């Protein structure tokens, strides 16, 4: 598919640009965010494969509902920003902003578990070959989201110094 390389290049430029901005402001933050992202990924993968975390219908519902709430808050913040309005506290380095970022990191991490479950279910049910791409793309999107949220959390923590 022609769009895959284009997407990969654009995403690389996007993540590289954001990472460069954060790195220029907070030296060393990118390597910390990358290490934490992969640490979370591997810890949750181990917890999922050993069945320390089980994906039940209630677990799935809770994670999807929390993710939807975060999307709504970010959409309101984005649209409000276009008109000069701010959602107070969540983007600041105060205790509420850090708490919100921590909550978002946890929800992003729990979305990894849903991705693992989707992949495992697809394998068990003999899903068509093209579904591998959907599963891989979903996992990639979740990892990018987790990385960006960890980056924001670390920036807020460093901003308190």
Task: Go through each PLM region and give its residues.
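A hydrophobic alpha-helical transmembrane-helix feature that marks the membrane cores
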Residues: 1-161
